[in-house]
Amino acid sequence: MGFLSKIVDGNKKEIKRLGKLADKVLALEEDTAILTDEEIREKTKSFQKELAEIEDVKKQNDYLDKILPEAYALVREGSKRVFNMIPYKVQVMGGIAIHKGDIAEMRTGEGKTLTATMPTYLNALAGRGVHVITVNEYLSSSQSEEMAELYNYLGLTVGLNLNSKSTEEKREAYAQDITYSTNNELGFDYLRDNMVNYAEERVMRPLHFAIIDEVDSILIDEARTPLIISGEAEKSTSLYTQANVFAKMLKAEDDYNYDEKTKAVHLTEQGADKAERMFKVDNLYDVQNVEVISHINTALRAHVTLQRDVDYMVVDGEVLIVDQFTGRTMPGRRFSEGLHQAIEAKEGVAIQNESKTMASITFQNYFRMYNKLAGMTGTAKTEEEEFRNIYNMTVTQIPTNKPVQRKDNSDLIYISQKGKFDAVVEDVVEKHKKGQPVLLGTVAVETSEYISNLLKKRGVRHDVLNAKNHEREAEIVSNAGQKGAVTIATNMAGRGTDIKLGDGVEELGGLAVIGTERHESRRIDDQLRGRSGRQGDRGDSRFYLSLQDELMVRFGSERLQKMMNRLGMDDSTPIESKMVSRAVESAQKRVEGNNFDARKRILEYDEVLRKQREIIYNERNEIIDSEESSQVVNAMLRSTLQRAINHFINEEDDNPDYTPFINYVNDVFLQEGDLQDTEIKGKDSEDIFEIVWSKIEKAYAQQQETLGDQMSEFERMILLRSIDTHWTDHIDTMDQLRQGIHLRSYAQQNPLRDYQNEGHELFDIMMQNIEEDTCKYILKSVVQFEDDVEREKSKSFGEAKHVTAEDGKEKAKPQPIVKGDQVGRNDPCPCGSGKKYKNCHGKA
């Protein structure tokens, strides 16, 4: 209780502080009102000039804090002249919280878009770029078009970044003072910028300040979804088909156990025996059968934990994911780790090839790279701990401009879903008769269609808004507040929509919101309630629940069931009890806690790859930006030679065999016969290094002479190709390691620590392989340059999607044609060890 009161007190103190600063802004209203349009723009130029002379980011921020009242007053005056609207004091307070790098929680209809204009203008003055981020391209386009009028009036430029834009158009959009974009497109542009071969192909500037609209949706709900650019992997789909047939044969409890609370499913001993017989293996859990067990587990997840028309839909022979937080389908996105293919096998549609990850990043790690991050939403307080721990952001609840008049009624709980839905329909019919508009919220497509059929039977005209007819969303939502309107919507109605009341509706009680089930997240329930009672309008809300709802089943409705039976309650009699509502909220908190733990765990694992990604991208960028790559190559040649000497030469051996070392040197650095054992026999390691190094220098000089002024371009191309090839393989290897690492806990090992240690070892091996490949190709390649080749710029950046098979196939840049010796993975290792290449120096 003490912790909660501290949060409440903290919010009160912060509101008081914001209020005082907002008063300073409002006090300048008369002074700014007398300025001419040109004088306002001159103020902008003056601020920009002052900031341009300050190089240090911290000192720039101090200056922005100093000019905040004057800058915000200018935006208020500009808004008054351009839109005939002036931000209220509470909006100014929200704008100050955003400038601080925090989250402004503002209720629906309180004008978040106008609130964001003040911190956007202020921070754009620094000239480092401000990204205003929305959840979809429709909102980015409409907001940038509308707000550009204000920013242009104030003397700032605005860019719009869309998936369909070309490289040039994207670069231009990012070069503006303010750039509107979706979170997806920003993440993909970052990844693509780190896959280019030439500096001029990059589109982004360094990440400075981002303001995220619907911040909880992007940083919490989508935190576990990685952005992935991938290419097609050559893998057979037959195992998916076999695993699907096997999963269909299994019986619950006998062959597998399913935990409804955690949604975990795994084979029993009997199920494992069946699998061994079906797949003809001796020990299912043997390391060599990891692919089989992986496919079986994935097929089980597809059959047991995922439901059609709830978690995904099948449209025109294609499996589309349904976003659990918006109810929308997500074309282009695919479940990763083979789950999408398992669902395709389950549904009998064409199984698409798996994809190989070429680059990936989670939103958690992408957004933490900004110098300053802020956001706004109607619902964030319930997740404040996560925002504080992971993003170092505080949630400030901004007061409403007018008091909230919506009445939130307590939940009604029924024994069965049939009893619940019958009661819902009766409530809708009654409200519809008097003309009160009703918004019915459901958690799944199938529920919305079921209620729709019940209402049709009662002759109630209504609209249905779900993933199957989302194209009419704007039209349906615009009519939802009209007299007599009945709208059934999945969670998708909760985002980016503002339902305005029609004539005479206020007198009828405003918009009535009816929830047909509690979502596992309290925020989603709050969003549904928030559709009603905007800007001081009247309204009411109520949730109808049943003991058969998923949340109730997962978190123990047995006690309630027994109590209702003991009281002799039938299906038509509900319980209306604060105790029950508290129990539901407690269940939601547990789910939220589980989800937070899962996101935290993902971040801990992803931190390993984040550090490695940073090293690789920094190295790539240094190579691209460097005029001279010979120093990098020289360092690689020296370290590779030194490693070989450390590995092959044992000075304590009285009768050493130099053959493996000579074979390795001739294979990686020199031509056959260039190094003889007589030259190094009896020499110590330092002498051997100098002897071989002089030969390497000679070989390098010959290559330089052959290539002339093309040498630097050739080296750069080889370096980038080596890095990209091995980095892509490394991501794949790390992904495989991560998929099976949790099994280590059964052996009393710490999976995270093992992942960190083994990931570090794999990274070291990859770096060595990059160096070795670079040495070999630079010294031993026969090079021919194509005549009159112009650099071909990528025409569009619109190919990357979430985990799709076509991603990452960017047009190749003109590069030297390399004719080098290739060693097959199963060939004998050239070092002479007698091992296969993949188990020796080809190890990745």
UniProtKB/Swiss-Prot annotation:
Q: Where is this region: Disordered?
A: 793-825
Keyword entries, A-Z:
ATP-binding, Cell membrane, Cytoplasm, Membrane, Metal-binding, Nucleotide-binding, Protein transport, Translocase, Translocation, Transport, Zinc
Task: Show the InterPro entries listed in the entry.
Answer: Helicase_ATP-bd, Helicase_C-like, P-loop_NTPase, SEC_C_motif, SecA, SecA_CS, SecA_DEAD, SecA_motor_DEAD
Q: Which GO terms describe its biological process?
A: intracellular protein transmembrane transport; protein import; protein targeting; protein transport by the Sec complex
Main localisation, per the record?
Answer: membrane
Localization, per the record, is: Cell membrane; Cytoplasm
Residues annotated for Zn(2+) binding in this entry: 829, 831, 840-841
Look up the record and name the cofactor or cofactors this protein needs: Zn(2+)
* Biased segments, Basic and acidic residues type: 793-813
The cofactor remark states: May bind 1 zinc ion per subunit.
Cross-referenced CDD domains: DEXDc_SecA, SF2_C_secA
Q: Does the keyword Cell membrane apply?
A: yes
Q: List the disulfide bonds.
A: none
Q: Which Pfam families match?
A: P-loop_SecA, SEC-C, SecA_DEAD, SecA_PP_bind, SecA_SW
Spell out the Gene3D superfamilies in the cross-references: Helical scaffold and wing domains of SecA (1.10.3060.10), P-loop containing nucleotide triphosphate hydrolases (3.40.50.300), SecA, preprotein cross-linking domain (3.90.1440.10)
Protein family (similarity comment): Belongs to the SecA family.
Primary role: Part of the Sec protein translocase complex. Interacts with the SecYEG preprotein conducting channel. Has a central role in coupling the hydrolysis of ATP to the transfer of proteins into and across the cell membrane, serving as an ATP-driven molecular motor driving the stepwise translocation of polypeptide chains across the membrane.
Identify the NCBIfam families for this entry.
Answer: PRK09200.1, secA
Q: What is this protein called?
A: Protein translocase subunit SecA 1
